[in-house]
């Protein structure tokens, strides 16, 4: 299976190689796209996005905004207003732990952001992994994707607020469900103790080749799985495990958790 799926990633691998020394140009292109997309929003009109050209003009005319300065605009978006900071209606909001004033922040997650940043970034990570590991059999088994939970946003239709990982799982390509565990219903359980037990039981008898998620959460799930299975080492449960994709924390924390996983 991996040999067949690998071909899907080949063209992107070539693009990534081509772009290795084009960081500045790529970032300028992204900025131009963002300005063009948002020019008819309230924020875009207030800051003359329609006539704005380039990075220098952007930095000269757009102040650095704190979350608190944008909070009123985000609250209006959460209540269903359109064309405020981004065109159309933004339905999803990632809830982050509050680092200022002990209050949570709600980060708008647009459909374009999901497609062009989060999912594309995940695709690119797999593309680079396959390129660097020609003997990989990662698609010959299952992917354990660990996420948080979400809840209705002000009871607005189809609008959700919660962990970014839960929003990603909720909107994932249905084809990914063919190789992903746990079931969506399990993945989105809000009580983590119940969730980690169910995931551990669901995953321990599957041929898992790769895992994804916040390292501290993943370690908790793996610890529970080892308790239930009675095994000493992770490879005894998943002999074909080869990759841990992670984010959400500082890289050195991820590496520390990876080492703990290896030791189990």
Range-by-range predicted roles:
Residues 1-95, 101-245, 253-254:
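Nucleotide 5′-phosphate-binding alpha/beta core
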Residues 23, 263-264:
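Terminal presequence/propeptide segments associated with secretion/organelle targeting
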Residues 96, 256-263:
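Conserved small/polar residues in nucleotide/adenosyl-binding loops
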